[in-house]
């Protein structure tokens, strides 16, 4: 839980700016995004965090099983880091941006699952989707009877 709440600690200001930005990322913004996992790791250490699982999950939450992630490009991240990555991707999909609409939760879950299958399939994606649900609390759905619930 601590890792999930602090995984983007090094880019809080940038996230707020990007929320409103309509233009493509600048080179500096792209660099800041790619370095935020390590900077977050270092910032948490400076703040006194010593739990290695927490620190590694923050550092590795953009790594992928295919080795195409960042910042290290490794494929040996922990299950905790992988779960954070999946949750981060899901949250990004369902969040509105100035340049695009939010993806509906059921579609975001489907995309997350299919993307994960293409990367070799990790059971954690199914676990996350099962926990979050395809219609999270607060969602409106139309029942077979036509009633909206």
Predicted regions located by residue number:
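Histidine- and acidic-residue-rich, metal-dependent catalytic cores
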Residues: 1-149
């Amino acid at each position: 839980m601590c890792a999930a709440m602090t995984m983007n600690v090094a880019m809080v200001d940038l996230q707020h700016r990007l929320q409103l930005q309509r233009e493509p990322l600048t080179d500096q913004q792209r660099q800041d995004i790619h370095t935020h996992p390590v900077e977050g790791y270092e910032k948490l250490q400076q703040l006194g965090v010593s739990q290695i699982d927490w620190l590694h999950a923050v550092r590795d939450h953009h790594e992928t099983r295919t080795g195409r992630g960042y910042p290290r490009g490794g494929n040996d991240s922990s299950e905790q880091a992988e779960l954070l990555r999946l949750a981060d991707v899901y949250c990004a999909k369902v969040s509105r941006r100035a340049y695009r609409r939010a993806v509906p939760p059921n579609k975001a879950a489907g995309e997350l699952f299919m993307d994960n299958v293409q990367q070799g399939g990790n059971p954690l994606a199914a676990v996350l989707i099962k926990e979050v649900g395809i219609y999270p609390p607060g969602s409106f759905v139309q029942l077979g009877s036509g009633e909206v619930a």
